[in-house]
Swiss-Prot record:
Taxonomic source organism: Photorhabdus laumondii subsp. laumondii (strain DSM 15139 / CIP 105565 / TT01)
Membership in a protein family: Belongs to the NqrA family.
The organism's place on the tree of life at top rank: Bacteria
Source taxonomy: Bacteria, Pseudomonadati, Pseudomonadota, Gammaproteobacteria, Enterobacterales
Protein name: Na(+)-translocating NADH-quinone reductase subunit A
EC number: 7.2.1.1
Cysteines engaged in disulfide bonds, as pairs: none
Complex and partners: Composed of six subunits; NqrA, NqrB, NqrC, NqrD, NqrE and NqrF.
GO molecular function annotation: oxidoreductase activity, acting on NAD(P)H, quinone or similar compound as acceptor
GO biological process: sodium ion transport
């Protein structure tokens, strides 16, 4: 077992009951283009066109052969684009249940599957895009091979679902997915999990279980990769979530695209925080209708630390998200708030009474309590960074755009979510995720 000592479990109210319920009927789903780093779409459908579930919507120009498929059957009602015609979302109104069929196999055939067969089925179905590389967090190029594959079978983000509850409902599909993934690498398939039992994978020596414990970010792929098989400019691994492993298992045994998602609907503004079974790309306005407390709320696809804010074209469940968080919009200003005792405020430093109330859960809002200011190194970053990285020096170099120094300090091991806690505890109110992405893009372009 690998025990993480540094980090932070945010004491936020509204944790979900770990019981799965069926969610409301969803009428619209969407595929969000901005979730895929560096992707440039070549559209294969138009607004008003009817599509089947699993039908190709577009192909990535920068990664030829990688296609993106429809998560539901219905009509394409909107293709939203932003600045420089960046694809924001493709919205589908669900009608009917037609779907594309893919290759299916008996479990007894899994050991005879070739890498080419597995890759073809994943690409054709669109499940290839569930895989992400580290470094750079891109969809892998067809024909490439990683040193290892990491399956994130735990989640330590604030308000997250217990992954073992969800895996227990589809044990066979999870094991099938793991066995299929072994065909994509000559290395190990590392299943990273928290305390508790997971399904037995039999005698497949390629699959290894790695137990992690401790505060967030103990459940992030970046943490697992750092402690088991660190990456570099010349070493690449892939990672994916446990629900995508289940979808891969069902694809190969049924020949159909499985797009169900079990998510946690949680947060201080949710009336009944719980686990909900819904679908990939679900409309968050439909999903949360009648579920929230009165007032102005912010709906977030993903964690409160690094999720995507719901807005006019982004109010859909993200491809890599298993959590919908809801916070109150904090628009009020507090006079001399810095001098108050702060019994209802949490701080990682000893500046509020809330810091000492270890069992209290706080109704966080979106209030930032101040604006952007100088970066002050007072040890906060080191408290929440469990990786063997000099956090303050790295963050300083990221802000300065020093790619050489940032690379030497380990930025290639990181993704935006790995710096989310640094953003939260930063007294200067800097957003380190977007800055990291700019530096990674520059490093990749420079070769």
């Amino acid at each position: 077992m690998i025990k993480i000592k540094k980090g932070l479990d945010l004491p936020i109210a509204g944790a979900p009951a770990q019981v799965i319920e069926d969610g409301p009927t969803i009428r619209h789903v969407a595929l969000l283009g901005e979730e895929y780093v560096g992707m440039r779409p070549s559209m294969l459908v138009k607004e008003g066109e009817h599509v089947k579930k699993g039908q190709i919507l577009f192909e990535d120009k920068k990664n030829p052969g990688v296609v993106f498929t429809s998560p539901a059957c219905g009509q394409v009602v909107a293709i939203n684009r932003g600045e420089q015609r960046i694809l924001q979302s493709i919205v589908i109104e669900i009608t009917g249940d037609e779907q594309v069929n893919f290759d299916r196999y008996d479990r007894a055939q899994f050991t005879q599957l070739s890498r080419e067969q597995v890759e073809k089925n994943l690409i054709d179905s669109g499940l290839w895009t569930a895989l992400r590389t580290r470094p750079y967090s891109r969809s892998p190029a067809p024909g490439s091979s990683p040193k290892a594959i990491f399956v994130t079978a735990m989640d330590t983000q604030p308000l997250a679902a217990n992954s073992q509850v969800i895996i227990a409902t589809d044990k066979e599909a999870f094991v099938d997915g793991l066995n299929v993934l072994t065909k994509l690498t000559e290395g190990k398939v590392h299943v990273c999990h928290s305390a508790g039992s997971l399904p037995n994978v039999g005698n497949n020596a390629q699959i290894t279980y790695n137990q992690f414990s401790g505060p967030h970010p103990a459940g992030l792929a970046g943490t697992h990769i750092h402690f088991i098989e660190p990456v570099s400019a010349t070493k690449t691994v892939w990672h994916l979530g446990y629900q995508d492993v289940i979808a891969i298992g069902k694809l190969f045994t049924t020949g159909t695209l499985y797009t169900d998602r079990v998510i946690a609907l949680a947060g201080p503004q949710v009336e009944k925080p719980r686990l909900i079974r819904t679908c990939l790309g679900a409309d968050l306005l439909e999903l949360t209708q009648g579920q929230l407390k009165q007032g102005e709320n912010r709906i977030i696809s993903g964690s409160v630390l690094c999720g995507t804010q719901s807005d006019e074209v982004h109010h859909y469940l993200g491809r890599f998200h298993t959590l919908v968080s809801v916070l109150r919009e904090g628009r009020e200003k507090e006079l001399f708030g810095w001098i108050m005792p702060g019994i209802d405020k949490f701080s990682i430093t000893r500046t509020t009474i809330g810091h000492f109330l270890k069992n209290k859960r706080f109704a966080f809002s979106t209030t930032m309590n101040g604006g952007e200011r100088s970066m002050v190194p007072i040890g906060n970053y080191e408290r929440v960074m469990p990786l063997d990285i000099m956090a303050t020096h790295l963050l300083r170099d990221l802000l300065a755009g020093d790619t050489d120094s940032a690379q030497a300090l380990g930025c290639l091991e990181l993704d935006e979510e790995d710096l989310a806690l640094c953003t939260y505890v930063c007294p200067g109110k800097y957003e380190y995720g977007p800055v990291l992405r700019e530096v990674l893009t520059k490093i990749e372009q420079e070769g």
